[in-house]
Amino acid sequence: MRKTSAFEQVYVHGSPTVYYKQGDSTSVRVEGAQSMVNEIEAYVTDSVLNIGYKNHRSWKVLNFRRDDGELRVYVTSPDLVGVKVVGSGDFICQHPLDTDVLTVRLEGSGDVKFASIVCDKIEASVMGSGDMRLGTVTTQSAGFNVTGSGDLDARLQNTQQTDISVIGSGDAKVDFANCGSANASVCGSGDVVLSGNLQHYSSSKLGSGDIDTKHLKVQ
């Protein structure tokens, strides 16, 4: 177990795999071969938990043996308002998350996965070739941006306003349940796939991309 001060944001740099769970207390636990555990650093600055390999080295540079297995970092905190993954690391939240405002950023080739989110507002962005799966999101306001070749997937509930932007060759897939207004824009060869039901919908497109609304019902 690593000792850290309180935090409400998690920043993953490099290639670690982080498993997050909302809980009553703050904790950081690193599991794996000792040679790998020794190379992981976790420290808090300005309420941000930073997780990565020492001196920002990658696992390839460190020459871990094949039988060292997988390294996992388990993190808990009472609240989570921000997640940032830079590189090829993964951030996985397999349990429900309940917060006020949430910002999620993925830069690189990593993955971000949530089971379900309840919040007032969410802003999520993918830059690069990574994949973001937000699960079921109950929120009043949502903003989704994909730049590059990455993918974003979300199921929205009771959302009043949603803005979706794809620039490049990436994809955004959003399902709506009992939602208000949504605006979707594509610039490039990317795709936006919308389904479910909305009260109002608008879109704009520049390039060879596509906005698929075959399974979208506008009331």
Residue ranges and their predicted role:
Residues 132-219:
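Short, surface-exposed interaction patches in beta-rich subdomains
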Residues 1-86, 90-106, 116-125, 136-142, ...:
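Acidic (Asp/Glu) and glycine-rich low-complexity loops/linkers
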